[in-house]
């Protein structure tokens, strides 16, 4: 059986790419997959823009759609879809770094993704 990959939450700061931590950058660059929230209207989001110059051409970029709505049904469906997309890589042993603008420990998109992963995939 393949060892599961690791899901990392990477705080990428407030917009200046030089504010990412050295450790965060190291993990980001060694991960096979880099996930990030899609921006409004499907455009590049802030987190993607911050990390773009640090990514290698061979890394898989995984944009995840988290709608800007308050409808719990719509949000739950989006979290489930995102968790399923990330799981496809983790179960084959790939590490996934989730780039998140700001601080992942404070009201972060990453926390919702991690909670959904745990509920959908207990082995996670």
PLM feature spans:
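Class I S-adenosyl-L-methionine
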Residues: 1-17, 22-24, 29-124
């Amino acid at each position: 059986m393949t060892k599961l990959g690791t899901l990392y939450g990477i705080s990428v700061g407030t917009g200046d790419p030089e504010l990412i931590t050295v450790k965060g950058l190291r993990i980001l660059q060694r991960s096979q997959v880099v996930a990030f929230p899609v921006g409004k209207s499907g455009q590049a989001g802030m987190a993607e823009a911050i990390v773009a110059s640090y990514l290698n051409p061979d890394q898989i970029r995984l944009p995840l759609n988290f709608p800007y709505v308050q409808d719990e049904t719509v949000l739950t469906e989006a979290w489930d879809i995102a968790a399923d997309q990330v799981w496809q890589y983790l179960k084959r042993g790939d590490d996934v770094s989730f780039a998140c603008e700001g601080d992942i420990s404070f009201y972060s998109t990453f926390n919702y993704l991690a909670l959904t992963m745990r509920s959908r995939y207990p082995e996670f």
